[in-house]
């Protein structure tokens, strides 16, 4: 076990008193024993699976709680932060008063006082000059395991004199009984204070709150320094060619960037500075619903000792039923990045990106499997951040639900979306990068585009054959589509071919175009936004 001479006395500075014992930066073996301790109850308890990984449940919180997210409004954030408009659903950055913050902080520090605590010191960001040194404090072993997997693990030398830039206090066992009087959403809370540099978590057990909390902080700090902060995966080819994959949850970021032919930089959060693209994280957080060894062998084989499964169904014999979504469709696994064989080592960073891929899972069946974007279309589709989900309705009818999430990650943005677009475009122009829109969703047949076809499309983008292909223009959206690509069924490249008649596509496409136009109106309050309208669909 690594020791940093951290004492209970040191924790008094955070308001945490009478700590019984500190388990500092525990080893994986220690965490394994702690999680499987038969004396644990409820959501603290881990279960051993036949794959060697421990599985835990996070209760009713099987995903993030965006409605319970708050940021303290003070002199630091008042004029810089992208605040939510009450009830307009623009984003989740709801302001919190200093008074309520102090109350929430008191609840969490009281919860952690007098306990045996796990403390993990780690880095967020692979570049030493811009990384955050983060200290995580929790009373739950598997939460310490989660952050050890997901953040960058310091060397023993780096732990000597480790000074945290940010403190995360996870009080999952405490709730806020005064939430109504304080005008909050519920008794649960995920609160950030960018002046005190502290994140507080109460009520929710979902591990991803710690991960995305620090992502929100990086999304605040980096663009103000001219560094792109991106919700994307990234990988690098044998010739050093870097590709980044933007996309919302479930569009294929992790799956498509985990490619045996290319080395993985990271699967979810990256920066892009003067040296190139770098990972914020030290692990991957992959969806496991319907995971199969055949379709996603790298991810399947990463699920072994030291990986941590969340909300999966474990049978009595210890086998995992990856097809069972009864607890949630958002079943997950976190694992240290070195569980993937083909990674960039020793530091998760590479040169400048030349291919920028926007992933969308279009459940309307309108968008083509791939199109090549102009510079203005790149900004338009980045700000739109479109995907669509299939949601079950009463009589078994599935109606697609459109989602527009600025920069393919509105939930984690702390500055105005146009600031991220400007920084990304500058980085792309300097590197001569080209953007593409790839639909990993459905077509007119009602079937999802196969991983095999999507991988062949990605290969064509990365090896340059798509750039050399002849293209035609798709009406309404004015997207440039290749007429043929190696290894891809030519019939599916034009989405109109997958409908009984072109009129059927036209009808659905018109409806989707209207949604795009309506959504983009929120960006037309600036001349830069107004200038991009012509890059979108035209009715």
UniProtKB/Swiss-Prot annotation:
Phylogenetic classification of the source organism: Bacteria, Pseudomonadati, Pseudomonadota, Gammaproteobacteria, Enterobacterales
Protein task: Involved in the gluconeogenesis. Catalyzes the conversion of oxaloacetate (OAA) to phosphoenolpyruvate (PEP) through direct phosphoryl transfer between the nucleoside triphosphate and OAA.
Source taxon at top rank: Bacteria
Signal listed as a keyword: no
Entry note: cofactor: Binds 1 Mn(2+) ion per subunit.
GO molecular function: ATP binding; metal ion binding; phosphoenolpyruvate carboxykinase (ATP) activity
Catalytic activity: oxaloacetate + ATP = phosphoenolpyruvate + ADP + CO2
Source species: Salmonella gallinarum (strain 287/91 / NCTC 13346)
Protein name (database record): Phosphoenolpyruvate carboxykinase (ATP)
Binding site for substrate: 64, 206, 212, 332
CDD domains assigned: PEPCK_ATP
Principal place of residence: cytoplasm
Cellular compartment(s): Cytoplasm
Cystine bridges: none
Cofactor: Mn(2+)
Gene3D superfamilies associated with the record: 3.90.228.20, Phosphoenolpyruvate Carboxykinase, domain 1, Phosphoenolpyruvate Carboxykinase, domain 2
Oligomeric and partner information: Monomer.
Binding site for ATP: 212, 231, 247-255, 296, 332, 448-449, 454
GO BP annotation list: gluconeogenesis
Example of a GO cellular component annotation carried by this entry: cytosol
Pathway as given in its UniProt record: Carbohydrate biosynthesis; gluconeogenesis
Gene, per the UniProt record: pckA
Keywords: ATP-binding, Cytoplasm, Decarboxylase, Gluconeogenesis, Lyase, Manganese, Metal-binding, Nucleotide-binding
